[in-house]
Amino acid sequence: MTTENFFAEIGTEELPPKALKKLATAFAENVENELKQAGLAFDKVEWFAAPRRLAVKVLNLAANQPSKEIEKRGPAVSAAFDAEGKPTKAAEGWARGCGITVDQAERLVTDKGEWLVHRAVIEGQPTKNLMLDIIAKSLANLPIPKTMRWGDKNVQFVRPVHTVTLLLGGELIEGEILGIASGRTIRGHRFLGEREFQISHADQYPSLLEEKGCVIADFNKRREMILTKSQEKATALGGVADIEDDLLDEVTSLVEFPNVLTAKFEERFLAVPAEALVYTMKGDQKYFPIYDKEGKLLPHFIFVSNINPVDPMPIIEGNEKVVRPRLSDAEFFFNTDKKQRLEDLLPRLQTVLFQQQLGTLLDKTKRIQSLAGEIAGQIGADKAKAERAGLLSKCDLMTNMVFEFTDTQGVMGMHYARHDGEDEEVAVALNEQYMPRFAGDNLPNSLVASSVALADKFDTLTGIFGIGQAPKGSADPFALRRAALGALRIIVEKNLSLDLADLVKKSAALFGDKLTNANVVDDVVDFMLGRFRAWYQDGGIAVDVIQAVLARRPTKPADFDARVRAVSHFRTLDSAEALAAANKRVSNILAKVAGEIRSEIDRTLLLEAEEKALAEQVLALQSELAPVFAKGDYQTALDRLACLREVVDNFFDKVMVNAEDEKLRQNRQAMLNVLRNLFLQVADISLLQ
């Protein structure tokens, strides 16, 4: 089979840096899917992305589509011809659809009869005739939230397109994509290398672009260069670079030929909380901060330039000049804010709405204060500290620093509280109330902080559900999904004995008559249990395990987690499959019983040896496991229940449950009811697949 490497590049104006990697990988995935759909063989699709280009390279792409045989079955011969042997309308219509006449059709004989059939071979097209359409479709299906038009063209794309290059080996695939005719012209770096040059063969990409155009098209290569050089620069300064993946990807998306440099700022700025300085460096300037070995911020930072002059000092000084006013602003805000105590800002919260129907931030603060104290009492935290932290929880939103640098909310509250002489646990809780901020983030360290974090999240969940504004589709303006999952993580991972329904009831009571949804408790609990499902599925827990536990609707998250772990373990036992099937059988039998089913077994009505054996074990386990269930030791309980497999199997093999004698029948049903209820104290095992 003849193969060639294929290459396609779309040259654009500067693409959105936060979206570049996603666009490039989606482009490659789309191309791969289109190639497979077209039946074209290939080894691999590589993707490339730089600020002004998206590109793919298909390795060892087949030069032709394979030919394929088709078989279209028509009507049965008995229905294809009338009594005189002439084709019926059904046969003629089918033949027309196949592009043949009825007499050209073949016959297919099966054990069910004889049929008309059309067989043909469709010759595969040359790959070069297909690639223009494949690339166009792949670009059209990119995840672009907002497109733009340019010039006098009617086409739309994420940014204006200037060049399109499609090469199959050395052959140019001619045509037009996004209003631009395909050609061999590749654009280089804006300031380095050749501005434009010609590419003659797909194999020359991306090396020719780097050699002539001073552009490293390989996103991952640029990323690794920036990461390695940044770490080296930080080490040379006796520190460690703070390089987050998202910021590294964004910086990689901003440069075509990275030049990693270091700069400094005045040490006096280190008197400002490091978080505010880092927010400016990372968020505004896209710099990498440097910390010493003890985690203290150093007066240096790393930045990445897109040019590589002989003398880098003008660039370094320029970046130092740019960041200085931002750090000065942070210093000014910090010093100004310290002139007022956090508590003095409480009245200003009355001027800011949390939500029109739910009141102001001051209203929310008072609810958090009350609920945090309630939660603290339940989990053994200091109630007074939790209430104090709840009272101060939103005060930093009124400071100059947080108004200017919004991502510093919480952390600045902590620093200002320390300055005010607040208890350290209270101060730290002001920062940790927002934890976890994202998937995988740290949880609050102390129980005081956990109390405030939970109070804040439950207040938001209860309030928004209470006015009927639950998330719909992907829209979640109050981040309720994140709040729910964060609350669940805190309760489960810290093993807190808290009940969701109880917390929502207490939270709802604090809203007075503001809530209009009478079902708010059930709605919030169901929503949070739904988040549990997603969380466990992401963690690799089988869906049927989650459904088995959900069927019992346990509303204590720590208890829910213990059940899931126990059922996951039970599922691995040799007896699990048979007991799940037996539970399903028991469930079906009991579902057909009219009226109430007894839950006491009458030993005098036990006749068969197999039912006596089952009753003996079931009653023994009922007594033995009562304290085990009370402790929530569900794994031990299921391990013990697993020993019932043999006696349950023997019972169903030898005993007729629905006996004609009513007393016998009801007693056997009662025994199955006791058996099933033992399992139901953990989960509905009958739902296991």
UniProtKB/Swiss-Prot annotation:
Where's it found, cell-wise?
Cytoplasm
Please give the catalytic activity noted in the UniProt record: tRNA(Gly) + glycine + ATP = glycyl-tRNA(Gly) + AMP + diphosphate
Tell me where it mainly resides.
cytoplasm
Q: Which InterPro entries match?
A: DALR_anticod-bd, Gly-tRNA-synth_bsu, Gly-tRNA-synth_heterodimer
Q: Report if keyword Cytoplasm is assigned.
A: yes
Q: Which domain of life is it from?
A: Bacteria
Q: Which UniProt keywords apply?
A: Aminoacyl-tRNA synthetase, ATP-binding, Cytoplasm, Ligase, Nucleotide-binding, Protein biosynthesis
The record's Gene Ontology biological-process terms are: arginyl-tRNA aminoacylation; glycyl-tRNA aminoacylation
Query: Which GO terms fall under molecular function for this chain's record?
Result: arginine-tRNA ligase activity; ATP binding; glycine-tRNA ligase activity
Pfam family of this protein, just one?
tRNA_synt_2f
Might you report a single GO cellular component term? Answer: cytosol
Record keywords: Ligase included?
Answer: yes
- EC no.? 6.1.1.14
Query: Which family does the similarity line name?
Result: Belongs to the class-II aminoacyl-tRNA synthetase family.
Q: Subunit structure of this entry? A: Tetramer of two alpha and two beta subunits.
Q: Which PANTHER family match?
A: GLYCINE--TRNA LIGASE, CHLOROPLASTIC_MITOCHONDRIAL 2 (PTHR30075:SF2), GLYCYL-TRNA SYNTHETASE (PTHR30075)
Q: What is this protein called?
A: Glycine--tRNA ligase beta subunit
